Amino acid sequence: TSTSENKAIQAFDFTAMDKDGKTVKLSDFKGKKVYINMWASWCGPCMREIPELEKTYQKLKNNKDVVFLSMTSPNDSEFKNQSPQDKGKDVILNKAKELGVTYPVLFDVNDRFIINYAIRSFPTHIFINSDGTIGNRIAGGVTEELLTKEIEKLK
């Protein structure tokens, strides 16, 4: 018998906001494989990997079993982040647009994502299995090849 199943860590059910101010929760995607890229508009390695992320998203966007998200930590008061890691929402969205990002950009609220996923560096990649457990996490930049491989490994 495998003990890895017993050690599976349940992913924290975060609540974030999308660009239109709508609430987005991890539990909205129950039963799906979820990939989340934590990034910041000032982060060089984040900017360099975004074209790789976008290529991966284009390959996967029609796959109904996979959810591709990005998370940021804006300093606007509406998000109530006590220790925001980025500038305001408009700066973040402009940077995303400039870099050709078409996947969803979410905004952390009350630092819940950063705290509960123990984000210490940017970028950080979180991979969540369809049963809601953490599949993997990678700190640092990724390539399209690595990202695709990690998403394919999710159960």
Predicted regions and their residues:
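N-terminal targeting signals for export/organelle localization
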Residues: 1-13, 155
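A short beta-strand-turn-helix
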Residues: 13-34, 57-59
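Short pre-active-site segment immediately N-terminal to redox-active cysteine/selenocysteine motifs
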Residues: 32-34, 39-42, 75, 121
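Conserved redox-active cysteine motifs that mediate thiol-disulfide chemistry
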Residues: 38-55
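Short, flexible/disordered intra-domain loops and linkers
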Residues: 75-87
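Short, internal strand/loop/helix patches
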Residues: 84-128
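Thiol-/selenol-based redox modules, centered on thioredoxin-like
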Residues: 121-155
